Amino acid sequence: MAYPELDAADFLQQLARRKEFKSLISPPVDQKELIRDLRAHFVQIGGPGCEKGGRAFFPCDPYASPFPSIKGLQLHNAQLFVQNFQNPNTPYSRLLLNWQTGTGKSIAAIAIARQFMNHYMNFIENAPWIFVVGFTRAIIQTEMLRRPELGFVSYKEVAELHRLLHIAKQSGSTTSVESRHLNGFVSTLKRRLTDRNRGGFFQFYGYKEFASKLFNITSKGEEKNFDVLSLFHRSDEAEDTLNENDISQFVQKISEAETNGLIRVNQKIMEQLRGGLLIADEIHNVYNIQERNNYGIALQYVLDAFPPHQAPRAVFMSATPVTGSVMEYVDLLNLLVPRHELPNGQPLQRQQLFDSSGHSVKWKKDALALVERLSTGRVSFLLDTNTNFYPERIFAGKMLSYKDEKLPYLHFIECPMSEYQLETLKQLGPDPKISSNAYSIYDMVFPNPKFSKQTEPKAYGLFNSTETPTALSMASTDWLLENGVQIIEPSRRAPFNVSGSFLSLQPPTHISGLAFYSGKYTQMMKDILSIIRQGRGKILIYHNRVRMSGVLILQEILQSNGILNEVSSPVGTTRCSICAAIRDDHTHSDHQFIPVRFTILHSEIEPAVRERSLALFNASSNLEGHQLRILIGSKVIVEGLNFQAVRYEMIMSLPLDIPRLIQVFGRVVRKNSHMELPPSERNVTIYLYVSTTPDGGPELAKYAQKLKEYILIQEGDKALRKHAIDGFTNQIKIDKPMLESLPLSPSITPANVGATVLNTFEAYGYGEQEVKTISNIIISLFMARPVWTYSELWKAVSTPKLIQGITIDNKLFSEDNFALALISLCYSKNQCKELWIQNRLCTIMHVPAKPEHLYVAAVLNHKKEPVLDIETYIRDFQPPTMHSIRITKYLEHSQTKEPFQVLYEKFQKDFQDEPMEQVLIHYPASFHYTMLEALIIDNLAGMGALVEVYKKFFIAFSKKDIQPFPDIFKIISHVPGDDNTLVGYATEDSVRLITSREDKTWHEIPLYMLNINVKRKENDIVIGYMESKGKALKFKIRPPIQVLKKNEITDIRMLNRGAVCETRGREEQQKIANQLGISLNLTKISAIKLCLLIRNNLLQKEMEARNQPNGMQDGIRWFYLFNDKMPSLVHTS
């Protein structure tokens, strides 16, 4: 066997010596030394002193990164390691990726899968399948379809996908033509992954779906209420625990149940998995003791049902493989280690690893050594806190003690319970046990209708989720008013919730406010206001629950203290996102009032709505949080969701355990999550709130208990990782104590790896991959420096970390492979490798010279021939192109659209004598957006009348228009031109402001920052708008939204969404015209002309409404123009 077997005494040593693994030891390099290397090779392209460091070959940016880089996705060393380890050429059957959150587990799994797919493509028939199972399967699919480097889509298809995504977003509707185009395109790409006739090898399942499709309960089984779990769990125990006497027989038991006609195993799935690959994400979910399910049973069955040589290979992924209980190690190891390699060939049982007495559990003697032995060669472990890529994690607060014992790792914001909370807690007795329906006591209590005044002696609050809704719902109206409580109308998503001034920091004098009912939430609100006053930065608030004291009440607390949801309009008590002052008291002259807004994510919100809110929160235009400052999330955010540029995380309740708490931290501390922020702001401050009493309190006791359990889990984690396959490559990252890991000293270190072994490197094609890597490095070096000698180039290529993103050990590169890479890039008459270098189309030329041959980045002329002379690297020989105005990213997609140049010529011809306002309704959005950018960037002559129309409708903005908004004016103040110079225009979602005409760069701000309200009230008569119908734009009308909402529609087909005006009945057309005040003899006018009159009248009224004082904020809506977002019309009854 070319690779060592796992049971070899020196397995890790043999593995580490092979070049495909040894080269992934990232050599330590001092930053100052690295800058010296850059300057020695004259390739510093940015940073202080870059012109000198780069010999001024090309313009450089002193504020940019100094390192040349390779465009596109580059697998990091850990991803390359597992790709090389778990592939068809190695004998290793199962692997756990135990990687810190945000380090690229999904990309690693896809890279592994790609190797197997390439192998399966050589099968003539009965090729196996790759199964991807998990709650985050959609994320993995998304990664596959947005990364052309992974080999599932082309660069052109990714560009088309981005274009369709943008157009669909601009349409504002999930049922629009644009959205249907997008969905169709995505479906086509996804079918390529799963349809064998199209070259697909993948099957995607959720855990529940996989288990239910694998085990089909027959009608006989349903009659007998058969449950697959009954084969594996004792029915006579209170807790759901594995029946260890039966688990070793579970394959046989399934067969018996199948013979008895109770169950039918899906043989199609079994055959697809035979010799295939199984990828299971967030593997801890399949055996979590606290959440009973049959997910793990299904996985265990498909892994154990085959003979070893036919069983599927498996890749498991989790940042926290053991969560709810340390005893889950038994279940993890049974999945990770093939049955025949376990002790005595039988599944592990808990008594083999643990001593338990009551609720006390501890590791048995030698149990950790057994974990070390069984996990050798089956675990990849990665921690990464490199602040070049990850934000710094800062914990606010202090460490606390419980019963004189210091709690390890965590810092807390201590929140003493209010007197009312303490009085309520007394009702549970001296040593309270908090049941699952009493969790609100940790956070707050609610007013109790049993007491007319909550301040009277011995009064106590409500907290039980069964009793509280009933008691408050039955309270009298007078009591509710007296105590500042408002019952929110129940809905499917929120059967019960309350609001009112009792949640305010500053309630009316006769009402007890938030501080009376919750010390924790009072401190949270104070911290939020303090953060806002300190400056910019987005905030994520986490609570494990939705109802009672969970995210729904947090939403009401924010609203009761002047913070708006996504759609509400500001009022006098609304707070400013910049200074936290309320609107009525906002006297700051240095900034405009911008309301603080929040959004909310929980499992009962529709996925499409969650995705939209998340996208807005993460958008680059919301980097400072001025569109959405705060996101409140429940446990739905713990896995699979990523948040960008969050500066503050507030954790209001402990998730089920400490490993899940680590997952919550990982939502906001992710690789490159803060790269758009200045370096000084690339950090996340974490606030961990805990309610306390004079003797500690039940919530602190809960943390103390979970931390004790976590210490046991950490001991198991350390044993699991002791012989990690890549420990020797990650030594400097894993040898420090931290919350995620005890300090770990790998059994193999970089210093004792030994001599390099090349046999598998050369046999399995890694040399070809090295040639590709070197080629990419060469191209990057030529982008920084246009002329090299052979020896200079080889020295630069073999210098570690000279290229950003390449962290392998370049010193192990073969010079033969370097020569091959260089030859493959050099120009020949039969082959021209085209490169874009500093926006010039170039190729690399080999120039024979003495004493040493030169290699030059030569510019290509219009015939694609290299032009080589002393100034070749600065001469710009680009192929001649027709001059045309730039088509912007707002160009809408439709095969029937005419090119802009054609429409432009038509516009010049048609509107010589016509009212210029008509241009707004005769041309599509693509024309207008392109025209607007041409007016702003190219300053087209003879367009004064059109500019005035755009300005009258508040579509285009001059410097003068922006001056009343000082903070915004700073963005464009440097742009050349007088007060009347156009500097921006409005789209459906934002205002685009030009920042550089030369570079064609733009800055986007929300519409509301220029007092543009996208949800102006509609008039009570009729609404007009234009819609594309083939090449034509059709005028359509519909009733106003408020009229639609009043109508009781029982059949969704009768919902009046709008129709072409000419198709309306004559009576309806005349009625609308009369209501609009069109005073003509309508009986003698054709339907077409009547609709033209209605259209022009609505357009005129729209212009007049917009030009009223504050018209773009409060004016009545009559007509939706090309850049207006139409409201979604849906049936809600």
UniProtKB/Swiss-Prot annotation:
It comes from the Viruses. It catalyses: ATP + H2O = ADP + phosphate + H(+). InterPro entries: Helicase_C-like, P-loop_NTPase. Residues 524-724 form the Helicase C-terminal domain. A motif (DEAH box) lies at residues 281-284. Its EC number is 3.6.4.13. SMART domains: HELICc (SM00490). It is found in: Virion. Residues 52-352 form the Helicase ATP-binding domain. Keywords: ATP-binding, Helicase, Hydrolase, Late protein, Nucleotide-binding, Transcription, Transcription regulation, Virion. ATP binds at W99, Q100, T101, G102, T103, G104, K105, S106. It is an enzyme of class 3 (hydrolase). Induction: Expressed in the late phase of the viral replicative cycle. It holds the Pfam family Helicase_C. Putative initation factor. Belongs to the DEAD box helicase family. DEAH subfamily. This is Early transcription factor large subunit homolog. It comes from African swine fever virus (isolate Tick/South Africa/Pretoriuskop Pr4/1996) (ASFV). The lineage of its organism: Viruses, Varidnaviria, Bamfordvirae, Nucleocytoviricota, Pokkesviricetes.
